[in-house]
Amino acid sequence: MLITFEGIDGAGKSTQVAKLVAYLKQQSTPLLSLREPGGTPTAESIRSLLLDNRKSITPIAELLLFSASRAELVETLIRPALAEGKTVILDRFFDSTTAYQGHGRGISLEQLHSIIALSTGDLLPDVTFYLDLEPEEALRRAFSRSGLPLDFAAQSNESDRMEQAGIAFYHKVRNGYLTLMQQHPSRFVALDATQPPDTLHQHIIAEVETRLKLHISPLVAP
């Protein structure tokens, strides 16, 4: 089963990923937890390249580097783990590309879809948890938060990065996510990210347990 987490920077994805991983480990669920970009030596090198050049890299170059990292991750780690029956949890996947590079940066969605299909081999998540948050609240959190794991490109200073991109950019990204949610209602589970983290965690656990039962039921049916 492939589980992905999506949302704008500051929505709390990484916190919920960590909580779900801890819970599933307690349940002795075989799993693999990964982030994008990263996870393999090649992908981590690409991550470093993106971080080091986040102010100067062009949107197309950014897209292709993300896609190269994703292709490596899918083929070397994700597909083998799924074949072994593991639950794979991803902090971001290709929906981030559609929301950020497509809706946010204005790259053609038709071009994006072709590149995404190539980099993933048409691999789809079984469920995508989307943590919805207004950009203004996300920026407020970025200013108030200190010493916690940050989303991609935020390792040095998340609030500076969000200010540089601009609130308008994050509204475009959020609208992109809302569009994706409407287009794929059976895959997306929308969560109000203003709720307390533990409340969100309980909602996520309930959904994951339900979907895990449905996911394995064909294997155990008489």
Curated annotation (Swiss-Prot):
- Residues recorded as binding ATP, renumbered to this chain, are 7-14
EC number from the UniProt entry: 2.7.4.9
Give the Gene Ontology MF terms in alphabetical order. Answer: ATP binding; dTMP kinase activity
Q: Which GO terms describe its biological process?
A: dTDP biosynthetic process; dTTP biosynthetic process; dUDP biosynthetic process
Q: Name one GO cellular component term.
A: cytosol
User: Looking at the keywords, is Nucleotide-binding present?
Assistant: yes
Give the reaction(s) catalysed.
Answer: dTMP + ATP = dTDP + ADP
**Keyword Nucleotide-binding listed:** yes
What keywords is this UniProt entry annotated with? ATP-binding, Kinase, Nucleotide biosynthesis, Nucleotide-binding, Transferase
User: Pfam families, alphabetically?
Assistant: Thymidylate_kin
Role noted for this protein? Phosphorylation of dTMP to form dTDP in both de novo and salvage pathways of dTTP synthesis.
- Family listed: Belongs to the thymidylate kinase family.
This chain's protein is named Thymidylate kinase
Q: Which gene encodes it?
A: tmk
